[in-house]
Structures are given as C-alpha cells and as structure tokens.
Amino acid sequence: MTIYLKNSFLLFYLVLVSFPIMSSNIIVPNEEILEKPFPLPYERIELSENDLRNFIDKTINNNKQPVVIFGANWCPDCRILSAVLDLQTVNKYMEDNFEILYIDLGRYDINMSLMEFFDIMPQQGIPRVVILNKDKEVLNIKDTGEWTTARSRTKQEIFNYFQEYKE
C-alpha cells in the first residue's frame, strides 16, 4: 500500500507542477485587433531635457509612472507598439497607471540627446521604451530595446511587459 501511496503522491505532484502558474496579468481579448492604418504617434517636435524633466515630475505628481518611448513614424515596430497601446483594454490600463511621452527621433536627427539622458545608446534601434518608477529611477534600463522587434511579438507579450513594471 505504501508504494501505491508514494506513486499516487508522485503522480499528483507531477500533474500539479506541470500546470502553468496562473498569471495575474490582464488578458487582451481576442476581439481586440490592431487597426490599420497604425497610429503615427510621433510629432516632429524638438524637446529639451527640461521638457523631459517636467513630464516626469508632472506624471509622478499625478500618481502615475512615466513612460518615455523613443521612436519615429517611419519605423514599423514603433507604430505596432503604439497600436497595441491603443487597444481598448491596454489603453485603459495604461491611462490608469502610466503617462506616455512619445519622443520623435526623426531620421536620427532630432532629440538624440534625450536618449543620452537615460544612458541609452542610440545605435541600438527603435522603439526604445523607458519606464520609470515614482522615485524617477529607470526600472527597465537593461531592456529598453526589448520592442525593437515589436512586429514579431504578440499584443499580449507587449501588454505583459508593461504590467510587469507597474509599481
């Protein structure tokens, strides 16, 4: 009988650990699809470090986390990332928790010094996403380039990324 119990316990344990751990992440409904044409979120406006600091301060004062996204409208990955952030479920979550500043890099001829503000090497591609906490610390400094391949990722992967960094 003890061998039977041991085997039963072992089988129960294997079944238990083989189930994926349930995530607390919000799921993007299948019916929410990316609408074409994709957004053009970048305006050719030159910003200063002072503008960037003001955005960060204002966002934190509004009890939200600042998100800065460097990119350009010619970049398909930038536009796809923006389209995912515009999905109803994602947009609601982002508006409740974050404030986003899209910074146009043009053809790498505008606002490049603002990437250096965060110690980001500009030659590593776009979009570059910077997520800060309410203490003005960059939370994702090691993977700001995660979405330079946004077009090969799912909308849920993109949404999960932002959910992981919410304070």
Give the positions of each predicted feature.
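Bacterial N-terminal signal peptides that target proteins for export
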Residues: 1-9
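N-terminal leader/targeting and pre-domain segments
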Residues: 25-62
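Typically the conserved alpha-helix immediately C-terminal to a functionally engaged Cys/Sec
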Residues: 79-93
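Non-catalytic, surface beta->alpha helical segment in thiol-disulfide oxidoreductase systems
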Residues: 124-167
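The canonical Cys-X-X-Cys-His
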Residues: 75-79, 129
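Thiol-based oxidoreductase modules, predominantly thioredoxin-like and allied folds used
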Residues: 94-112
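Short active-site neighborhood of thiol/selenol oxidoreductases, capturing the structured segment around
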Residues: 62-75
